[in-house]
Amino acid sequence: MAVFTPSYPLTFPTVSGVRTQRFSLVRTVAVSSSPFTGQDQVVQHEGEYWTTQISFPPMLKDKAAQIIAFLLQLRGRRGTFSIGDQDRKTIQGVATGTIRVNGASQTGNQVALDGFANSTNNVFKAGDYIQINSFLYMVTEDVTSNSSGEANVKIEPALRQGIETIADDATVVYSNTKTIMRLDSNETAWDTDQVSKYGISLSATEAL
């Protein structure tokens, strides 16, 4: 018996667009409050990851079949797919051309980049997404390049230390940015009504 395994991550289907999307960043923060003083002890752990919940618009069976086939190929939580914030596929900033990582083995909530136009304001703006390797980050402050086309870019979440290797000159994606996710459930289900309109939704978490 031949066993076919899809090549993951799968490409997210575009046959219908999405009706609604919730996109969120989850952090692992422990808070312990003293019962005597009321003071908090706060510890932020390394775990940070994107999640999404998507609802597709009502559709007839020809389009629904393509969405369902995509979901079934994921085989529950086994497979992965690429997706980003569907309402933020382009940046607000003025960056053009090829932007690259400026220096290897970077860590933390700031990444040095180069390849910008020299001495330019707002090459990225707060709220823009960038993608390094297969991981997604949001720029948290407007960015101005220096006279050499370099800039230090503040981001959330922090660079994925221990998961991702940041190589010097790695290309930075800033259009149609994505990360890799897997479904939150092993069940694949859909609804239909009396006129064969399909209702399909999914929930997924970044695959780290």
Predicted regions and their residues:
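Extracellular/virion structural assembly segments
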Residues: 1-208
